[in-house]
Curated annotation (Swiss-Prot):
Swiss-Prot/TrEMBL keywords: Antibiotic, Antimicrobial, Secreted, Signal, Toxin
Described purpose of this protein according to its UniProt entry: Peptide that induces pain in mammals and has insecticidal, antibacterial and antiparasitic activities. Induces partially reversible paralysis in D.melanogaster when tested at high doses. Shows a moderate antiparasitic activity against the major pathogenic nematode of ruminants (H.contortus, EC(50)=30.5 uM). Has potent or moderate antibacterial activities against A.baumannii (MIC<0.25 ug/mL) and S.aureus (MIC=16 ug/mL). Has no activity on the other bacteria tested, nor on the fungus C.albicans.
One of the record's GO cellular component terms: extracellular region
Tissue expression as described in the entry: Expressed by the venom secretory cell of the spine. The spine is a cuticular structure containing a single large nucleated venom-secreting cell at its base. It is an independent unit capable of producing, storing and injecting venom. On the back of D.vulnerans caterpillars, spines are grouped together by 50 to 100 to form scoli, of which there are eight in D.vulnerans.
Upper taxonomic lineage: Eukaryota, Metazoa, Ecdysozoa, Arthropoda, Hexapoda
Organism: Doratifera vulnerans
The protein, known as: DELTA-limacoditoxin(2)-Dv11
Protein's cellular compartments: Secreted
Length: 57
């Protein structure tokens, strides 16, 4: 359970870094909004997954 959360966090950080490197200050606000939207969706699905398999710990 902890490993999954750590992996997800690492993945999000790497994704943000790669996006920031690829888009230097061009449309940054719009980009951030898009990232937050995707991030919320990912977090929601991750919560569902961890919720359904939470009894295994």
């Amino acid at each position: 359970m902890k490993f999954a959360k750590t992996f997800l966090l690492l993945f999000v950080v790497l994704l943000l870094l790669s996006i920031v490197m690829a888009e230097p200050k061009r449309g940054f606000g719009k980009l951030l909004r898009k990232v937050f939207k995707v991030g919320r969706r990912v977090a929601g699905s991750a919560a569902e997954i961890s919720g359904s398999s939470g009894g295994e710990e």
